[in-house]
Amino acid sequence: MTSDASQDGPDAVAGSGDRAVAAAAERAKLTAARNIPTFDDLPLPADTANLRHGANLHDALLALLPLVGVWRGEGEGRGPHGDYRFGQQIVVSHDGGDYLNWEARSWRLDEDGQYEEPGLRETGFWRFVSDPEDDPSESQAIELLLAHSAGYVELFYGRPLTQSSWELVTDALARSRSGVLVGGAKRLYGIIEGGDLAYVEERVDADGGLVPHLSARLSRYAG
């Protein structure tokens, strides 16, 4: 099958690129002025999800810079009772330290795309492994530590695949007495066409294999 791009020729590709750049610039006029709310009476740097404001991003986090911001959109999930749609907001912020703050919360959508009920929620931190005792080949390993509202804590390790995509795999998982029983996961995040943040998550099922669990495409809301 021949793609539309090859049929239309280089001019069409260039035109599409120009339109995408123009659309991104227009969105940036709105998102550039937005940031997360903070209290201004604390004696330490405030969290910011906008690289134009607040503390400078720590040099160790430059490979994660595209993630910083507030992202909103919709996705699809697969649970024990079948497939479902959800809305989601992800906030990625920093205070100048050598880690990123991560907060993701979602809500179930009904057949009409309207809010139905609260969904999954997680909070945690991204950083790069920098232990001098580690193997030098591990110097660019990403560490993601998450606490889930469903009652478990999860530790991921991974690597940047490109300047705008990152892959992580569960290394350890601990469940509370009230927590749901889940298997490990594999996640792939990436900045895609139009500047959106997209991701897919697969989780280990009862048979021990990775199966699709979550996927979403989120647009930048702030930052």
Curated annotation (Swiss-Prot):
The UniProt catalytic activity note for this protein reads:
peroxynitrite = nitrate
Outline the subunit composition.
Homodimer.
The record places the motif (GXWXGXG) at: 69-75
EC number(s) from the headed UniProt entry: 5.99.-.-
Concerning InterPro entries, the annotation shows:
Calycin (IPR012674), Nb(III)_bact/plant (IPR022939), Nitrobindin (IPR045165), THAP4-like_heme-bd (IPR014878)
According to the UniProt entry, its GO molecular function terms are: heme binding; metal ion binding; peroxynitrite isomerase activity
According to the record, cofactor stoichiometry and binding are noted as: Binds 1 heme b group per subunit, that coordinates a highly solvent-exposed Fe(III) atom.
Free-text comment on this protein's domains from its UniProt entry: Forms a 10-stranded antiparallel beta-barrel structure able to accommodate a hydrophobic ligand in its interior. In fact, this fold hosts the heme group, which is located in a wide surface cleft.
Q: Does the keyword Plastid apply?
A: no
Its pathway?
A: Nitrogen metabolism
Q: Could you confirm whether the keyword Transferase appears in this record?
A: no
Binding-site list for heme b: K186, H213
Q: What is this protein called?
A: Peroxynitrite isomerase 1
Source taxonomy lineage?
Bacteria, Bacillati, Actinomycetota, Actinomycetes, Mycobacteriales
Query: Required co-factor?
Result: heme b
Regions annotated as coiled coil: none
Alphabetized UniProt keyword annotations? Heme, Iron, Isomerase, Metal-binding
**Family, similarity comment:** Belongs to the nitrobindin family.
What is the recorded function of this protein according to its Swiss-Prot or TrEMBL entry?
A: Heme-binding protein able to scavenge peroxynitrite and to protect free L-tyrosine against peroxynitrite-mediated nitration, by acting as a peroxynitrite isomerase that converts peroxynitrite to nitrate. Therefore, this protein likely plays a role in peroxynitrite sensing and in the detoxification of reactive nitrogen and oxygen species (RNS and ROS, respectively). Is able to bind nitric oxide (NO) in vitro, but may act as a sensor of peroxynitrite levels in vivo.
